Every structure is written in C-alpha cells, then in structure tokens.
Amino acid sequence: MTRISLTRYLVEEQRKHNTIQPELRLLIEVVARACKAISNAVSKGALAGVLGSAGTGNVQGETQQKLDVIANEVLLDANEWGGHLAAMASEEMESFYEIPNRYPKGEYLLMFDPLDGSSNIDVNVSIGTIFSVLHMPKPGQTVTEADFLQPGTHQVAAGYAVYGPQTTLVLTVGNGVHMFTLDREAGSFVLTQSNVTIPEDTKEFAINMSNMRHWAPPVRKYIDECLAGDEGPRGKNFNMRWVASMVADVHRILTRGGIFMYPWDKREPEKPGKLRLMYEANPMAMLVEQAGGAATNGEQRILDVQPEKLHQRVSVILGSKNEVERVTRYHQEAQAKA
C-alpha cells in the first residue's frame, strides 16, 4: 500500500482540482510543521516543565497555561517568514499580528486557537490546535481588523490537529475532509482516512450537562427527549459524551457521528455564546459541513454569520445533520411563539 504524505496529497489535489494554489499548499505545510512541534512539546509534558499556569491571562479573560503561550509562539514563529501571509490572528492575542516588514507578505490570513481544551493539559486528556485560512481582500495593502471579518463561507482551508494517543491532522480545502496521522519515526503526516463522512443520524450527544439549568428552553427540550430514551418521543436510547475539549469532541463526531452543543446560557445573557466564531466555530463548521454534517448557532448556519469583531462569540450546535436540524427547528419554533 502506497503511503501518501500530506505534501503529496496537496500536490495531487492541486493537479486534480486546481483549487490549491502553491502558496496555500506551502502555508498548510508550514502549519502542519508547527503542529508537529506543538505535539512534541505536549508529549514531553512534565519532563520539559511545560505543565501548569503561565501566570498570565489572555484577551478572553482566561488564565493562560504554559503550553497556551508556547503553542501560540510556535505558530507565530513558524508562519511569519514564509511569504504566504499578510497577517495572523490568535485567540490568545488581543489584536492581529501583521507580518513584519522584514519578511515578504502574501495573500492569506491565518487564524488559530493555538491550544484548544487547555484545561485538560495537566490531566493528560486530548487537546488540539484549530486553524482557518482566508484570502486577504486587498493583497499588498495595510492589514486592518476589517480584513479578517469575513463570513465562514469565505474560508479557503480549515483544519485542526488533535494531540491524543496519536497526533492526527484533519484538513479540508473545500474538497471533503481528510485525516493524516503523524508518523513520528518518519516525521511526516500520512493520509490515513479520505473523504470522512458524518452519519446523518446518531445516538450520542456532547454537552456540559452541569449547565442544564441555564439553557434556553429549546436546548432543554432536545436534551430531555434524549434522556427519555426509548420510552420517550425519540424512541431510542442516547449516550452522552463530554471531553471539555472541542477538538476531541468534534474528532469523535467526525469519526463516528454525534452532535456537539455549546449553547447560549442565561448566566451571561448579553453574550451570544462561549466559543469564538473566528478561531473555533467557523473552521469546525467548515469541516463538519464538508463531511456531510451541519453546523448552526440555533438560528442560522454558522458559516453565514457575518463577524463584527475579531473575538466574537457564538453558540455552536454541530454534527450529525438530522440532529442539528432538529435542535435548530426547536429554536425556530420557540421564536415563532415568542
């Protein structure tokens, strides 16, 4: 069996579909190399003294872990000099990072959550890196925040790396979803699954049940029906899964189906949700849709949401298509009665 590396896959996709420009191919390869470096740091853990808090906070008001800071720096350092990017934006930084004048500038914008699920770092549970690529609207001009504020439909590539028992890179460039496993001996990502498909139906849901009392009625209705099992209106038993790492939960859904929900709750009613639209929801929504699933905020398709600011938050409901459509319908019915 011929082993297909990430580089070979990207070159062959470029030849077949002519949708991957050489600059985009090289950008994806650089991001993949950065993910290998992050995977190496994660795997060393306490041996390298990288566990625990960094003693700082990010723009989200969250305490940064040492590996949050390390992963962010790895991605910045790896991508700033290649000539493929005009700027980068990170969940960990208040403003975007424009490529310094000492380096050539390209036509793409890169956004990333350098280490998703960082509350799991010290307990050795799967975490990951999420990334999204956009075209720079006006290449060659000074970058502004407005250049990043494009709906998710404008993404030219999206993906994540999950650092678990294996390190797996999951990628879409608009032609389906493909998984690459890191061969540590060879030092390369190898294609291990092509054209990933999410089943339309499922018996698994992922949500933080401890917040149930804070949810809106449509979400409670859906979960109540799941919990009622084969004696309830759904006529089947459901299992719950919750890792508290979006990368890990979405990876499970891409692998075997399910629905992931991080909904609005009434503790912070002025915020539309918890997850970040640009760094988490949009890239994951693109991946899920490319795999035949669906992703909404309860009211509209996530990829259609027009961003208004870099660190905008959003409710997220994604996964198996029929389940996502059911939850969305419950929201629409509740709005119609209001």
UniProtKB/Swiss-Prot annotation:
Top-level taxon: Bacteria
Record EC number: 3.1.3.11
UniProt cross-references to SUPFAM superfamilies, sorted A to Z: Carbohydrate phosphatase
Positions with a binding annotation for Mg(2+) 1: 91, 113, 115
Sequence positions that bind Mg(2+) 2: 113, 116, 280
Subcellular location: Cytoplasm
Chain sites annotated for binding substrate: 116-119, 208, 274
Cofactor note: Binds 2 magnesium ions per subunit.
GO cellular component terms given for this protein: cytosol
Pathway: Carbohydrate biosynthesis; gluconeogenesis
A Gene Ontology BP annotation from the UniProt entry: fructose 6-phosphate metabolic process
InterPro entries with a match to the protein in the record: FBPase_C_dom (IPR044015), FBPase_class-1 (IPR000146), FBPase_N (IPR033391), FBPtase (IPR028343)
Enzyme type, top EC level: hydrolase
Subunit (UniProt): Homotetramer.
Protein name: Fructose-1,6-bisphosphatase class 1 1
Annotated organism of origin: Cupriavidus taiwanensis (strain DSM 17343 / BCRC 17206 / CCUG 44338 / CIP 107171 / LMG 19424 / R1)
Top-level taxonomy: Bacteria, Pseudomonadati, Pseudomonadota, Betaproteobacteria, Burkholderiales
